[in-house]
Curated annotation (Swiss-Prot):
Monomer. GO terms for cellular component: outer membrane-bounded periplasmic space. The keyword Chaperone applies. NCBIfam families: lolA. This is Outer-membrane lipoprotein carrier protein. The keyword Signal applies. Belongs to the LolA family. Keywords: Chaperone, Periplasm, Protein transport, Signal, Transport. Pfam families: LolA. It comes from Aliivibrio fischeri (strain MJ11) (Vibrio fischeri). It is found in: Periplasm. It comes from the Bacteria. InterPro entries: LolA/LolB/LppX, OM_lipoprot_carrier_LolA-like, OM_lipoprot_carrier_LolA_Pbac. Residues 1-17 form the signal peptide.
Amino acid sequence: MKKFLFSLCLLSSTVLASPQSELTERLNQNAGFEAGFTQKVLSPEGDVLMQGEGDVKILRPNLFRWHTQTPDENLLVTDGNTLWYYNPFVEQVTLMGLEKATTQTPFVLLTRNKASDWDNYSVSQNGDAFTVSPKADSAVKSEFIVRIQENGKVTGFSVVEQDGQRSDFDFTKFEAKKPAKNNFTFAIPDGVDIDDQR
């Protein structure tokens, strides 16, 4: 009888774990990772609008480097305070404060996982896929679906815009390791236009 009650208690605690707490626990499994990615942008009707690829490095909290190589090269990197967006084709770099730049995107949940970040979202779970939806009064309007295994391996994510357009990102060559901190700085190249929005 005691074994039965103990098993029932364990089962109850598992059932009572919310999707948000499960996602938080999985995100906390690793302090950083590196991966390649492929990207596909789909219209609301499911037509492929664009495909791309690149690589990403994340070191929690707040450090990330997102390098898109195709179809058009660009780089998004932050040192935890300043966010640089560099577009070599137009020879311009935009500087923003990290807090301001990430307030309205659920991507911030991958990079820092602070308790207060969850205030604007509700979370549902379907296996290893967690749908992070903005609450009605939130300034965030896009839905974020993160695919993460129990061991903390992030296999990809999707962003669904209000109009139904969808961007799918699938991670390849995932390595659960802390990238070196020197990946999260940016030296502005000579001769580029600087748009400082900090």
